[in-house]
A protein has these predicted regions:
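Binuclear metal-ion centers of metallo-dependent hydrolases, dominated by the metallo-beta-lactamase
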Residues: 15-22, 107, 111-167
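Alpha-helix C-terminal capping segments
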Residues: 7-11, 62, 81-85, 141-148
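Active-site environment of divalent metal-dependent phosphoester hydrolases
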Residues: 2-7, 22-25, 39-41, 76-80, ...
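Active-site metal-binding motif and surrounding structural segment of the metallo-beta-lactamase
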Residues: 1-17, 85-91
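Core dinuclear metal-dependent hydrolase active-site scaffold
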Residues: 17-84, 155-167
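Metallo-beta-lactamase
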Residues: 58-107, 112-116, 120-129
Length: 167
């Protein structure tokens, strides 16, 4: 984002900022910035000296020769998250954090894209089950997600081969 670009430049690092909706290419992969709402700092006075805006955070939509992947980013649920073109796979955060989708919001996203593979993320990599951003339990998804066979529980570093959906 433009905000992250400013932080990089403050460190004298070469970078390019992008706005939500911008598209850029990395070789044969097209990348689009998707909206996110993760300005949690604004809810806690004194946490930061600046006011954060929604466009400071983002998700990423990757269009690859093998298919599309939506990396949602850390975000609260936004209406536009439910009306995007269907991806082939979603890096799927299903924790119960109010600054993420919440469990119920994550289920809404999963069921809005009933053919997208759900690559579970943002859980199990931090031993902190009492801390809501990391408290996801994959077993809870199977009874509430349409087409639960698309839920993919991968170990860290486990390969995943993306294939374009036949829909």
């Amino acid at each position: 984002t433009v905000y992250v670009d400013s932080l990089m430049k403050n460190l004298n690092l070469k970078s390019v900022g992008h706005n939500i909706g911008d598209n850029f290419k990395v070789k044969n992969i097209s990348v689009n910035l998707t909206p996110a709402d993760h300005a949690y700092q604004n809810a806690y006075p004194g946490m930061s000296k600046r006011w954060f805006k929604n466009e400071d955070a983002c998700g990423f939509w990757f269009d690859t020769p093998d298919g599309t992947i939506w990396a949602t980013g850390d975000s609260r649920l936004m209406p536009e998250h439910l009306t995007m073109k269907a991806p082939d796979a979603i890096l799927f955060d299903f924790s119960d954090s109010e600054w993420h989708f919440t469990f119920e919001g994550a289920v809404k996203i999963a069921n809005a894209y009933p053919d997208a593979l759900l690559l579970l993320c943002h859980w199990g990599s931090v031993d902190s089950p009492e801390f809501s951003p990391f408290n996801g339990d994959p077993k809870k998804l199977y009874d509430v997600v349409v087409n639960p066979e698309r839920i993919k529980v991968l170990a860290p570093g486990e390969p995943f081969v993306l294939q374009r959906s036949k829909r």
